[in-house]
Amino acid sequence: MSDSQDKNYISFEKTEIGQIVSEAPAEKYVSFQKKYFNRLTIIGDSITQKGFTPGGYCAELMNFYQRRLRVDVWGFSGYTSRHVLRYLPEIPLEIDSTKLLIVFLGTNDCQLTETGYMCPVDEFKNNLLALTRPFPHSKIIIVSPGICTKDICFKREQEPYVIAASETVNTLNKSKANSAGLINLYEITKSYPTPELLFTDGLHFSSLGYSLLFNEIVATISKAWPELLPNNLPLQFPHWSEILFT
């Protein structure tokens, strides 16, 4: 159903909006947003932080969900899952209104230093579970690290972390059926005919790489939770055709 045909929207009584404006605007408006506007929350590292560059997957998801879900993005360049978990209590997340959570970490965890992995694989798995635990009512997509065509800072060994991401999804689905999905970005990028075109520097995605990731996210949602596709979500505020002559 096109946007112009959509009659399924979130409507608000004029009296309710009037009360919000007249009684303590800041406090009431925040309450109003939390009550009505559901969200897509994304947590990741630099690949997510750069996700608003032209063609970036965060920008594409924000466009995809215009006036259907608010998109909250928390990308932390250079962070491992350990670092994100450390600062999780300080991130102003809207947990109750998050319909879909995407966690894309592991690219920094799997770096091999002189003393071992930057974040050991068992800890990585536990961190993923801890990061998703505050979202018991959200659908969750775990994105595994992809390949790298060049070593940046350190050599990376992704395969154990892909397995850990898969095991995390299995654990989440045992707790609550069909609550989580996996995007195996390692296999997807590895099997791409010309993988070097997916990256700007061998690690961070080009617009082509981001497009590949965006399409995988949409495919995962379509298969597992079609009710979360934009056309199946209410429009936030009436369509212009409903109010043009009012």
Swiss-Prot record:
GO molecular-function terms, A-Z: hydrolase activity, acting on ester bonds
Catalytic residue positions: 46 (nucleophile), 201 (proton donor), 204 (proton acceptor)
Pfam families for this protein: Lipase_GDSL
Documented EC number(s): 3.1.1.112
Subcellular location: Cytoplasm
Cystine crosslinks: none
Reaction(s) catalysed by this chain's protein: 3-methylbutyl acetate + H2O = 3-methylbutanol + acetate + H(+)
InterPro entries reported for this sequence: GDSL (IPR001087), Iah1-like (IPR045136), SGNH_hydro_sf (IPR036514)
GO BP terms: acetate metabolic process; acetyl-CoA metabolic process
Broad class of where this protein is predominantly found: cytoplasm
Residues carrying the site annotation Transition state stabilizer: 78, 108
Single GO cellular component term: cytoplasm
Keywords noted in UniProt: Cytoplasm, Hydrolase
Family that this chain belongs to: Belongs to the 'GDSL' lipolytic enzyme family. IAH1 subfamily.
Protein name (database record): Isoamyl acetate-hydrolyzing esterase
Biological source species: Schizosaccharomyces pombe (strain 972 / ATCC 24843) (Fission yeast)
